[in-house]
Amino acid sequence: MHFTRRAVSPRASFVFDRHVGTINSSLSRRPRISECVEEEEEDGGGFDLFEEMRQPIQENIPMIILEEEEDDNDNLVMSVARPVRVHFAVDVENLHAHQSVYVVGSNDVLGTWEATRAMPLVQDPDRFMRWKGSIVTDVHQLKFRYFIGYNLMSDQGERLIVDKWEAFLHPRSTLCLAESRNDECRVDRVDLFGYYAGRKCVSDGWLQYPDENQILLRLHGNALKFYKTAKERKNCRVKMTPLDVRFKAPPSGHISFSYGEDEEDEEEDQNVPSNKCTHSATHVAVLSDPRPKFYDQEDTGVTFNNNKDYLVFRTHCLAAEFLAFYIEIFSEERKRIGACYALPSSLQDASGIIHLPFINSSGRPIGQVSIEYLCVRALTRLDGPQFMDQTYCRHWKKRNALEVGHRGAGNSYTKFAMARENTIHSLNTAAKNGADYVEFDVQLTKDRIAVIYHDFHVLVSVARRDGLAMPPPMTREQLDSSNLDYHELPVKDLKLSQLKLLMLDHLSFPQKKENVKKLVEAGEEEEDFKPFPTLLEALTKVDPDVGFNVEVKYPMMQNNGEHECDHYFERNLFVDVILADVMKHAGNRRIMFSSFDPDICSMVATKQNKYPVLFLCVGETQRYTPFQDQRTSTSMTAVNFAAGADLLGVNFNSEDLLKDPMPVKKANEFGMVTFVWGEDLDKKENINYFKKELGVDGVIYDRIGEEERRRNVFIVEREQKRALLSCSGASTPQRAASPSPVSSENNNTSPPHSAKLTRNAQSDSALLEENEDDVEHLSDKLNITGFQSAPMVSTK
C-alpha cells in the first residue's frame, strides 16, 4: 500500500493506490518518515511531521469514508470529514473568583487564535480547580492554548482581559479523527494549566484594546516621610487600592473622620454596574525580595523600609482618565496610620513622580509619600489584532552560546573596525562573518522615523564667517581645519533628510584617533555604507538568516546629575513606532529587544506577545557613568527586576560579571536567559570564560568572525536537518530567502507580503523555528548517529 500524508487542510485526505481498492481500518504504526511528504500550502501551513511524532500512537483507528474522487495520478482520494466532539479539561490552581479559563485555537469555534473570540470553559461543580468544555469539528488536527482571563467594563462594553496564558512555542495539539473513539476525542484527557510536553511556560497577558492601560506605581528610596517623628518608623506597610472616581467605593476600606461625613450624590453612584469594574485588582512585587514575582496584596499591605525595599504595584484599567488610587499606611503592628488619594489629575503624564501628603483619622496631615508612576498604553499602530498561535516571548532553545555582532561589525568611531558601525554594510558584514545575531541601537528622528544610531547627539560642522561678502569655495581639507565650529545637536531634533544631507561627525571626532571611521566621509558613498539607515531598511536589506538584537535607545538620568537627552519623546509614542516597524516587516527573522531603561523593557513586553525582551544592565562599573535608576545599579537587582517584569532574561556588563558571577547563577535559578556585553569581550579568553565556564546564552562583541571564521548556527542547524531528512529519503520545503524589498524613500510603505499583520507571516515564522528546533529530536527518532547541534567553536 502506498501511503502519503498531504498538507493539513480543513478536510484531511488520505491518498492510496487505486489498485489496492481498500484502506486498512486500523493503523498499528505510524508511517515512516520516508513515507511522509511535508507539503506547504500558500498560507505557510502544512503537515507538522514533528508534532505528529510527539503524539501517542493510537491503534485501531476507524476510517469513515464520506466521499471519493480521483487526483491527477489516478489515485483515489478518500476524505474523512465526519464531525468529532473534542473535549477540553484543564486544572488551574489559585484562580480568583473573578477569573475564568478560556481555550483559543486553530478553528473558528476557538477564535482562530484571537483572544477576544476564545471559547470560555465551564467550572466543574464537583472539582473547583477543573474547567471543561467541548466543540464539534471535522478537522484532522486541532491546535489550542489555555489562558486565564477576566472581564472589565469600558465605554464600549465588556472587554476580555488576558491575565496569564500558555506561551509554549508549540501549542497543544490533538489529532481529532485519529484519537477519537465513537466520535469522541480527549474524553478522559485532563491538562494542567501551564504544563505541556514536560515543560512549564506561563506568560503575562498583553494590552489588546486601544483604551487598555497598565499602571505601575513604584516605592523606593526615601519614599515615606513622617512630619513629627523624630525617629524614623521601620517596617511600615503600604497598600494601594484602585478606584474609579465616577463611582462610590466600598466604605469599609476608607478612613472615617471624627467630624462627620461629606454629602455624596447618591444618584450618580447608582450608575455603577453592580458586578463589573473598569479596573483590575492591584498586585505587588517586591524587587528587593528573593522572590520578586507579582502577588496579591494583603489587607494591610506589604512591608516597606526606606532605602531598603523596592515595591512595584500593578493594575490594568480601561478608563485611565478616571483612575485613582487610595493609599494606606499601616504600622508594623498592622494598625492604620494614615491614608491619601492619588487622583487622576496627579497621573496625567505617562510617567513621573508625585508627592502626596497623607492624613490620619482626624484629618491631620502626618506625613508624605513619594511615588513613581508609569502608564503603559496599548500598541495601536498595527492593522489587526495580535494572535496567539505562535510566540517567542518565553522561548529559548538551549545550545552553545550565540555570538552577536556588536553594532554589526563593531564599534568604528572609537575603535578600529572594517566597516562603519550601525550601517547596512556593517550589519551584512557581520552576517557574512557568521554572526548569529547582530546588535544595533534604534532611536527616532524629529519626523518620528526609527533610525539606527548609537549616540543621542551628533556634531554639526559649521564654517565661521570671515567678513567676506562672498567666501571662496573650500576643499574638504579646509573644511576640516580650524575654520570650522562644531555644534552638538540631538538626533531627535533633526529630520531624516537632514541627517542624510548635513555634514555630521561623531561626538568623539575632536579627539579623533588613527584608523577610526568618520561619521560622514568626503565624496559620494553607496547607500548601504551611509550612517543613519532606517530600521525598515535593516529589516528588508540585511541577510534574513541573521537575527536582530534591537536595543531600544531611551535617554536616562545619570548619577552625575546629567541627563542623556532632555525633553525626549513620550515613551509610549517612542516604543510604538519601533514596535510597529518590527511587527509589520520582520517576516521570519529572529528578533529580540533590549534596553537599558527598565521602563522601556516593561513597555515592550506588555505591548506585544510575540518577541522576547532582555534587560540591559550596567551594574557596578568604573568604566561607564552609572544611571540613577536603582534597578540598573547592580546586576542582582537587574535579575530581580527582569524576573518580576516577566522578561526573557538579562544582558549583563562583562565588567561586573568578571568581579562577581553570582548574578548569572541567580538568573539561571529563575530560568532566565543570560547575555553579556562589554569591552572586556575584546579578549578571546574572556569570551571563552563566559561561554564555557559561566555558560551564558549569548556574547556580544566587536569584529565578529575576523580573527576566526565561523558560521551562523541557524544555517548550520538547517543544513543538518536537511541532511537528516535526505538520509531518510524525505524532502524538505523550500522557503523564500528574504522578505520582499521595500523602497526606503517612504518609511510607511510596507512590503507587499506584510501590508497587514497577516496569519501567513506568523505561520511561516513558527514553522521555521519548529523545523530548526527539532534537529536533535529528529535525529533520535531516526536513530542516526554522527549529527549534532551546530558547533559554536570557530574553525580556521
From Swiss-Prot:
UniProt keyword terms in alphabetical order: Hydrolase
Ranges of residues in domain GP-PDE: 401-711
Polar residues bias (residue ranges): 728-765, 785-796
Ranges where the record places region Disordered: 726-796
Gene Ontology annotations of biological process type: glycerophospholipid catabolic process
Superkingdom in the source lineage: Eukaryota
Matching SMART domains: CBM_2
SUPFAM superfamilies, A to Z: PLC-like phosphodiesterases, Starch-binding domain-like
Name assigned to this protein: Putative glycerophosphocholine phosphodiesterase GPCPD1 homolog 2
Gene that specifies this protein: gpcp-2
